[in-house]
């Protein structure tokens, strides 16, 4: 089992440097998505590690967007995060804001799913249900093809993420929708308490 800080400690660090509800919601979503993927892909014993990486992946983004994934190691060291966790967090910015390569499967999942959760979340907000619970891949693909929709979500990063994992775009979308379904209620509850 890989070592990581207690969730309460990780969440406190996130909130120390992030106050915007949107950023906290995104972090909680990616935390839940990463936990789901760990269990789905056979890494259940490391689910807490995967989830912590998801929770902290954007720890530096709100205060230091121009130093995203560069400032993160310093912040993560405040709570004694391992080099492995720091590498994983930084790797999701590969080719975007840093040159840390995603090597482990978990890092590749984070790289792929991070951007896609933003697109899925935006698509969910457009649905009558405002939820991913009734979202299908075919509906998401229509939004994906519309470059003006959620324009800040890079389709190139999502495609590269799927390629790094050796998955089709549809497979990545389907799995990430399922992952977001698994944590949507808990994330909404946590965000409403902010």
Predicted features and spans:
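A structured, mid-to-C-terminal "fold-capping" secondary-structure block
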Residues: 133-194
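Predominant activation on well-ordered alpha-helical scaffold segments within soluble catalytic domains
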Residues: 11, 28-35, 70-73, 120-123, ...
């Amino acid at each position: 089992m890989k070592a990581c800080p207690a969730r309460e400690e990780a969440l406190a660090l996130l909130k120390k440097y992030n106050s915007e509800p949107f950023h906290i919601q995104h972090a909680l979503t990616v935390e839940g998505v990463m936990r789901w993927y760990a269990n789905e892909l056979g890494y259940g014993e490391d689910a807490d590690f995967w989830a912590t990486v998801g929770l902290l992946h954007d720890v530096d983004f709100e205060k230091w967007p121009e130093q995203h994934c560069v400032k993160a190691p310093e912040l993560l060291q405040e709570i004694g995060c391992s080099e492995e966790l720091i590498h994983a967090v930084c790797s999701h910015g590969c080719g975007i804001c840093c040159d840390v390569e995603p090597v482990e499967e978990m890092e590749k999942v984070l790289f792929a799913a991070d951007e896609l959760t933003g697109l899925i979340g935006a698509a969910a907000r457009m649905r009558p249900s405002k939820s991913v619970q009734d979202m299908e891949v075919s509906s998401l693909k229509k939004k994906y093809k519309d470059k003006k929709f959620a324009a800040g979500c890079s389709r190139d990063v999502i495609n590269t993420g799927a390629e790094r994992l050796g998955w089709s775009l549809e497979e990545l979308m389907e799995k990430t929708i399922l992952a977001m379904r698994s944590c949507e209620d808990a994330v909404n509850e946590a965000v409403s308490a902010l």
